[in-house]
C-alpha cells in the first residue's frame, strides 16, 4: 500500500529520514502515527525507527540530544524541531512485566516490529508513502480488529499495561478485540497489579473518553481487568450498569471520575479516598467533590443558588454533562441563565472584605471574621440583601450584636 499524500505533520520530518537513508541506513515512521494516517484520524506526534545505531545517528546529524540512549533513542534537532529516533531493537527479560531487563540493537525492521503490542501498531511507513506491513496490520485495520502481534501471552508478559491498552483502543477506535487476544487478557489479568496505578489510570481515562466507551468497558469487565484496579475490585454490577447508557459525551477527567463516583455511590469522604488510590491530583479531587452533589441536585431539580455558587460555573457544566449520560440533564441554556442570575459568582465579588470589616466595623481577624463574611456572602447569593457596602455593614452590626 502506498499513501499518495502524507499528512502535513510528516513533511518537516521527511528530510530527516532521507538523510539517514542517504547515509546507508533504513528509517521509517512507525506506530500510532502510521495507524492514524491510514484511519484518517488526528496525529498528535510522530515516531521514527531506524537501523542506524545511536552513535551512527549522532555522526550523521550535528545537533542531537541523548533522550534515552540506553534504549536507542536520540533526539535529532533540525531547524528548531526535535525528532526522536529509536534504533531497531529486541527486548528480553521482563521481570517487572513492564520494562525489559535487556535491550539489544538490531538492523532488522522485522525484529523491531515483532516486539510491538498490536498488529495495527506494527506498521512502518517510508518517507515516500510506502506502508510496510509484516503482520497483517492493514487487514486488521480494515476488519476493525485489535490483535496482538504473535503470541498474546508473550506480549502481555512483556508489558502487562498492554491489556489496558487493548480495551482502551476498543473504545478509542471503536474496534473489536481479537478472540485469542481477549483470551490472553483474561488469563493474564492478574498481572495488571504489577503496573503502576498512574499508568493504569491514564488508560482508563482514555477508555472512558474514547469514541465508544461502552465497547471498551464491556471488555474491561469481561476480561476481569477491573478486579485489579483500585476501588473497583467488587464493582462488576456498578460498572455493568454503565453498559446500558448510550449518551456518552464525557469531555474531561472530572466528568468521568464523577460518573464512577456516582456508580459506586460514594460520599464526599469516600470520593477523596477512592481518587487518592488512583493518585489523581488534588484539584481534580476537589472538582469531583463539587460535581457529584451537583449531578444529584440536577437529577432532583433541586439546584439552589447556594449550591450553584459553591459549585461554580465549570463544575456545573461538568455536572450537567454527567447528568446527560443518565438522562437527567436540564437545558444547557437554562442552567447558564440560572447561574448568571446569581448576584455574585465568587466571594471576591462581595462589596466588602476583611479590611473593611477591620476599619469600618471593628471586627478583628479570626474565626468570627470568616463566619461573618460567609454569612454575608450566602445572604447576597440568596437575594436576602443587596451587594452594597452600606447594607452589608448594617448586616454586620446585626450579626455582631447577635453573636
From Swiss-Prot:
Q: Does the keyword Acyltransferase apply?
A: no
Coiled-coil regions listed: none
The reactions it catalyses are: a tRNA precursor + 2 CTP + ATP = a tRNA with a 3' CCA end + 3 diphosphate; a tRNA with a 3' CCA end + 2 CTP + ATP = a tRNA with a 3' CCACCA end + 3 diphosphate
Q: What does the protein in this record do?
A: Catalyzes the addition and repair of the essential 3'-terminal CCA sequence in tRNAs without using a nucleic acid template. Adds these three nucleotides in the order of C, C, and A to the tRNA nucleotide-73, using CTP and ATP as substrates and producing inorganic pyrophosphate. tRNA 3'-terminal CCA addition is required both for tRNA processing and repair. Also involved in tRNA surveillance by mediating tandem CCA addition to generate a CCACCA at the 3' terminus of unstable tRNAs. While stable tRNAs receive only 3'-terminal CCA, unstable tRNAs are marked with CCACCA and rapidly degraded.
Task: Read off the PANTHER family from this record.
Answer: CCA TRNA NUCLEOTIDYLTRANSFERASE 1, MITOCHONDRIAL
Mention any additional remark: A single active site specifically recognizes both ATP and CTP and is responsible for their addition.
What is the name of the protein in this document?
Answer: CCA-adding enzyme
State the encoding gene.
Answer: cca
